Amino acid sequence: MFIAGRVFSFWFIVIVMAAMFASIYRSTKLGKPPKLRPLAQVNAIDEAVGRATEMGRPIHFSPGFAPLINLDSAQTFAGLALLSYTAKLAAKFNAPLIVTINQPDVFPLAEEIVAEAYVQAGNREGLKADTVRYLSDQQFSYSAAVFGLIMRERPAANLLLGRWDAASLMIAECGA
């Protein structure tokens, strides 16, 4: 059952995890939730949305290349969670948002996330029909479409979150 030479590592991990869960359980019973530090990346999103609002220019957001049913779908769901956060900020500050999608199964989910964020922020009128755009499911065709969009719209913030391949460097350079 156990691999020779790994018994100590196994029991060490079990003891450390048990101690961690016990301390978290005890602290929540006392009414003190564990202290979590803020993520610098989320603070950067706040700054980027604020900068775009001040400049009066749009925010470009893309949740990456992975579809919803894939080994890499967790990265897409993380990108969509950050899309919700970014869309709420954009709706709150009335900053134009452009969301580009390259997977057909992600498109309706992204549309619903953005619409819900605008409704929650009380800015239903700020939502435009072309806020979420499906471009292409091919990596470099998508990149070319994003290049054109960046050149036309001149976004103040270019947020690429989720799973990315070779095109991410080109899009980031174009959007810089």
Model-derived segments and spans:
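Hydrophobic core segments of alpha-helical transmembrane domains in multi-pass membrane transport
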Residues: 13-25
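Short, strongly hydrophobic alpha-helical membrane anchors
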Residues: 1-5
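Membrane-cytosol interface motif
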Residues: 37-54, 58
